[in-house]
Amino acid sequence: MIVRMWHGRVPAGKAAQYRTFLNARAIPDYRSVAGNEAVYILERHDGDVTHFITMTFWHDEAAIRAFAGDDLTRAKYYAEDKEFLLEFEPRVVHYEAVGSVADSAPQ
């Protein structure tokens, strides 16, 4: 399984709106792609900036390609992101999941 990680920063005053957007728009988009196994959105407040990380779990590179296109590590953005993000990081990072244990998904 491949874990795809993206990082973005928003002004702290827009964090709640961006969280709502990610849950309403981005998560359903990820989940609509065959081979997407899970999505987690992480959030960390740091003064006047809030950091978001999306961790998406994919069956294989073919599934990522169906979502992101042929350039597998190129970040994918939505038109609405321009209302929130402080910059547009061009790349994501992929990791191979090599171990796990979970009783249930975080709520």
Where are these regions (language model features)?
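Glycine-rich beta-strand-turn "strand-cap" elements at beta-sheet edges
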Residues: 2, 37-50, 76-107
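Short, well-ordered beta-strand segments in beta-rich or mixed alpha/beta enzyme
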Residues: 2-9, 38-70
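N-terminal first-folded block
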Residues: 4-36
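Non-catalytic surface loops within mature trypsin-like serine protease
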Residues: 12, 60, 96-99
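Residue-level signal for secondary-structure boundary sites
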Residues: 16, 62-64, 100
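An amphipathic, aromatic/His-enriched active-site/gating alpha helix that lines ligand/cofactor pockets
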Residues: 24-36, 57-94
